Curated annotation (Swiss-Prot):
The lineage of its organism: Archaea, Methanobacteriati, Methanobacteriota, Methanomada group, Methanococci. It comes from Methanocaldococcus jannaschii (strain ATCC 43067 / DSM 2661 / JAL-1 / JCM 10045 / NBRC 100440) (Methanococcus jannaschii). GO terms for molecular function: RNA binding. Gene3D superfamilies: PUA domain. This is UPF0113 protein MJ1410. Belongs to the UPF0113 family. InterPro entries: NIP7_N (IPR040598), PUA_sf (IPR036974), UPF0113_PUA (IPR005155). It holds the Pfam family pre-PUA_NIP7.
Length: 159
């Protein structure tokens, strides 16, 4: 895949997504210079260190580098690892669930409202356990958190 730096329009898409979950200060101070783009069927945004980015021109075809932070199709969507990276700073669009729901969610199951300790926001949300450890991504409709992808996915699917 071809590797390149982010374009300004792509940075704007990432800022827009980050602002759904974090505050303005985090969005402004985020290290966008640590992000690069892998061009394939769609644009994969990877987070890595500056030293690695400087050495990427030594390689012709790169399959992966650093952590996949998200993907750009029409919009930017944070990946599981992207959410993990920003999780200490998430203040909007999240849910905290009880222990039983945590276990079920990590097995790919959905979460019912009675298992939710705290929720802020609707739609695509970050899901945490009661210790505020990031578990995965869900879709909250006011009654159920539908599991989109969780940390247990790596073990179940061999990702």
């Amino acid at each position: 895949m071809k590797v390149r730096k982010l374009k300004n329009a792509e940075i704007n898409l990432i800022e827009e997504e980050l602002s759904k979950y974090t505050d303005k200060d985090f969005v402004k101070s985020f290290k966008y210079e640590n992000l690069i783009v892998l061009e394939g069927k769609w644009l994969t945004v990877c987070y890595t260190n500056i030293e690695t980015i400087k050495k990427l021109n030594m390689f012709q075809d790169i399959f992966s580098v650093g952590n996949v932070f998200g993907e750009i199709k029409r919009k930017f969507r944070l990946s599981l690892e992207g959410f993990t990276l920003i999780s200490p700073n998430i203040i909007n669009n999240y849910a905290i669930v009880n222990e039983k729901a945590e276990a079920l969610f990590l097995y790919g199951r959905d979460i019912f409202k009675e298992s939710i300790i705290e929720v802020k926001g609707f739609g695509r949300i970050a899901v945490f356990n009661k210790n505020r450890e990031f578990l995965g991504i869900g879709l909250f409709d006011g009654k159920i958190i539908k599991n989109i992808k969780d940390k247990g996915w790596y073990l179940r699917e061999g990702g």
